[in-house]
Amino acid sequence: MPGLVEAPVEPYARPVRTLVQLALDPDDGLEYVSLNSQVYELIYGDLSDNKTRFVSLQLLGSPLFVEYQLFRAELDSELPQDSIELHSPRLSSKYGSDFTLEKCIVVPVTKVLSLTSVIMSFPHDVYRLIEGISKERLLEIVASERGSDAGHILIRKTDFLKTLHGEVIHCEPVDQGFLSSDTNLVIVKQEGLKRGVNGNVNGSHPDPSEIPVSTPVDFSVSHLGLGDLTFDDTSIFSNLTLQPLELQIGFLKYSMLMDCTHILESSHEFDHEDDQLFACVCSSVLQKLGCFSGDLVQIQTCDCGAGIVCACDKSARRKITIRVFSLADPNDFDPEKLYLSPIFLNSIGNPRIVFVKRLASQRPNGDFVCEKLENHVPVAKEVVIARVASPITLDRTMQHLFLSNLKTYFESKHRVIVKDQYIPVPIDTVLAKSLFSTYNASGDETQPEIIPQGIPNELAWFKITDGTTETDDGKSLVAGKQYIIDPAKTRMIQSGVCSDKVPLSDGISYSQLRDYFELPRQFAYPCLRISNVLTFPYANQLRKIVSVAFRIRDNSYSRSRVQTTILLSSMARCVGKATLVRRIATEFGANLLELDAYDLLNQASVSKTIGTIRGKSDRVVDSCCSVILYIRHIEALAKKPDPNQQQKDSMSLRLAELIDEYTSKGAIFIGSTNDADAISELIRSKFKFDISINVPTEPERKLILTDLLDDMKTKDKTPVVLRPDVSLDTLALQSAGLTANDLVSIVDNTITIAIERLERLSEEQKVNWDQLLSFNGGRIKLTPEDFETSINDARNKFSDMIGAPRIPDVKWEDVGGLDVVKDEILDTIEMPLKHPELFSKGMKKRSGILFYGPPGTGKTLLAKAIATNFALNFFSVKGPELLNMYIGESEANVRRVFQKARDAKPCVIFFDELDSVAPKRGNQGDSGGVMDRIVSQLLAELDGMSGAEGGDGVFVVGATNRPDLLDEALLRPGRFDKMLYLGIADTHEKQAKIIQALTRKFQLDPSVDLGRIAETCPFTYTGADFYALCSDAMLNAMTRTAGAVEKKINEYNCNREEGDKISTRFWFDNIAKPEDTQVLVKSEDFAKARDELVPSVSAEELQHYLSVRENFEGGKTQDVMHTVPDGADIIISHD
């Protein structure tokens, strides 16, 4: 029988969670990781090979170590089981035995990527020295410091180079890899750079080596295997005289408790305790208290806020028992704060300071078993819980889910409550409605035993109204005293509904409670003054209205009953009206009932529509406190009636009565619409406040992007961060004209593009996803190229739908000289953009430019070049687009054009063929006078553009061939006050420059002389004629080249039999030489094109345009008249 052969161990390619310790005496000065035998064999499968191994390591337990770092790995058989040792001279010299982190994640690395580009920064003196050495010598110095060969230097972004006092500030395509001679190495000066976390440039956290650490006591004793140790009867703290310690209060996030303490590594003795009683402190605080991590302490609160010198009676202070845990070192938390959850702080009044004292009975014999909470807090025998009235708790479709979540909340742990405490329970409203529609709506009363957790998006509130205790002969609960709810002993009764508003202590907001439960984030709409302009003024206006309305309603001395009705309107969709209302409701703790008019509308019956509204709203308005009733798309319920019909609008009448009824009961009624003019006059008159919401301005877009890009994660919880070279200012400028919803789409699309980019890199380098992600620190990093691609995709896909303007790609080089014209344009456009402060004191801006002259002289292209040169968005408006058969709609179209431009500023509005848009008033034959009204509206909008407020960043450019037909009012100062004549080139040198600009991408024959070609052209050629000349010359060259190739093919086929003759395609695929496909434009091609070209403007017509010019510029000097058209025809496209 053959012997058994042991199968080789397959390497484990997934991340491994294991124990870590810091080497206290690294003697070689190098950074690497030692793996014990079990870990090494698990991830690599072979202990006998001598290959150089690498791992990516992330330390767990401290916010200072949030990224993976790449290390060389070695085998160390003497290490304890399932553990590794980190050799880091920098961390060891700073922390030594104070380093208390115990857990890490190890990602095995099968291949380290070679870096294509690395940027290093050095001090000024070192920079000058490095300039004199070669790249090879620099690599040798770095390799010597790293203990590796010059061809494979392991380098990480933010690494500090001790020998040269330099720093690695950028790496591509990933943040960590091999630096070699093939790497593009860029050296910069270190001026203005700041080191952050792990040396991160401009980071938000300090370097871990710079964080002061206090000497900790044993942070957790339950998992150290000390159960067999015994002490004598004398407590280890018996000789300490411990006084109450005064601490400030900090907010505790649930993730902070799980990630930054050792509670998960401890025993399961805390699994059933209420995590709302868990507090976190720095280890130095535990030492002062004489406590271990996990001990019970007593906090005392006082409302006077006098601190340690408080003169209040100590017996009057409220005493509360909590359990305290130590934060792992190193960390950047405040050592003078006690971190508690905002839910618990709200229940005790959110004191500014507390007095913390160790319980005297804690560990009396020095044992290592934490005392139980039941020894200090009594168990309640019965508890009565009432629902707090809200649109959620009053909704029958959500009843089963929020009661199920309430039951789970109390059964999962032994909760600690006090009388009159308010308890929030997260609920997924989408899941609740789905369960109701699946079971109850179909008549099935049986509910599923196991309910999915879902993704909570709202809070259902409950209140402890009454109860009895097991002791004291079943007396009622005492206010302010703690009680434990033991599911096995306590009887819980859910009964009644209370209409109270959930009270919050000073310093705690409803938004902080949402953040604690990790509910969907809401944009805060900050009101900031940026460049002398307030951001989100409409949000501030809505805040003031809602605040005053609730304050008057809550004022018991006020006899007035204010009926508050607000209309939110916008010209664009998806600008965030509903998001704004939700945020304002959250800020004020109001009960928001949000309805969609299209869901309520019944076209066949007004009574059924009103009945549906009442069925959803009556109980909420009657039972809840601080109600906001919000109806979206209110124009669907209150359309403006046809004036030709005599039928009364009963829907509007009934809706108006409903609005009066609800507002008289104290509710705030808010409606929103995208077309305020479509609402009936009756309902429109009911709204006392009309707030217009515009597309976000550039500062507002930056704030929105900042919020969207903060703390991003993918669906699998992978962190997403910005690369340091991403500029939010640039993104805000590039996203001009886009709404908040569009920005959300752009960010999501950018993340998708970044993931696809990394997936392509993973396939190309044959590295799995986990390893590649660890090379970027375990994060997906968004680059400027990702955002540029996403924004361009958004504009290409949705430009027609959202009316988003684009920045054209026409440069000054495409247009040509125009020195005088450029100077005029710089004075008009560049000055307000670069120095807006000059116009902040009422000075009017000259924002109108009029190009006129013969057709084909590049007026349109010049306008596009303005937009490109100054990075402005570009709106092109044709005259017929503004005309509409309905009275008032043409003027409204003009208003919409200028409003879109204001939304997309900085922006250029270009009116092509302006004489068709704004002809002289009184000369038109239309019976309705629509053209006259368009001119009047255009004049009013132009005046608004030149004003100091609202028109900044919007420039108007017009083009016409007939300025004599324009209304004279358009040409006065402040409107189109800059008139620039674009004529034809009057010298052969200028014509040669035109041809040179047009042919700069051509392949010209060496014998071609553009000056001689220009000398053969008449002075009646416009820019469009020269474009036609060059295009025809290229076409002639292509025809000539094709003929020559056809001749070669015929000659080749002459000596071949009929069946062996080749085709043109075969010739180009197999036989043709490079010169056969090269198109060279020769002088004969230009000559032929010139002979066939007919000038677009005759000499008589040019004379007419010159006479028109003299009429408009008669007061100008002859020199200016001749310099304006210089080079005006240097274009590459028709007008």
From Swiss-Prot:
Gene3D superfamilies xrefs: 1.10.8.60, P-loop containing nucleotide triphosphate hydrolases
**GO MF term set:** ATP binding; ATP hydrolysis activity
Highest taxon, organism lineage: Eukaryota
Q: Which terms are listed as keywords in the entry?
A: ATP-binding, Cytoplasm, Hydrolase, Membrane, Nucleotide-binding, Peroxisome, Peroxisome biogenesis
Question: A single GO BP annotation from the record?
Answer: protein import into peroxisome matrix
The protein's Enzyme Commission number: 3.6.4.-
Q: Which SMART domains match?
A: AAA (SM00382)
Subcellular localization is given as: Cytoplasm, Cytosol; Peroxisome membrane
Similarity comment: Belongs to the AAA ATPase family.
Q: What does this protein do?
A: Component of the PEX1-PEX6 AAA ATPase complex, a protein dislocase complex that mediates the ATP-dependent extraction of the PEX5 receptor from peroxisomal membranes, an essential step for PEX5 recycling. Specifically recognizes PEX5 monoubiquitinated at 'Cys-6', and pulls it out of the peroxisome lumen through the PEX2-PEX10-PEX12 retrotranslocation channel. Extraction by the PEX1-PEX6 AAA ATPase complex is accompanied by unfolding of the TPR repeats and release of bound cargo from PEX5.
Protein name listed in UniProt: Peroxisomal ATPase PEX6
Name its species. Answer: Pichia angusta (Yeast)
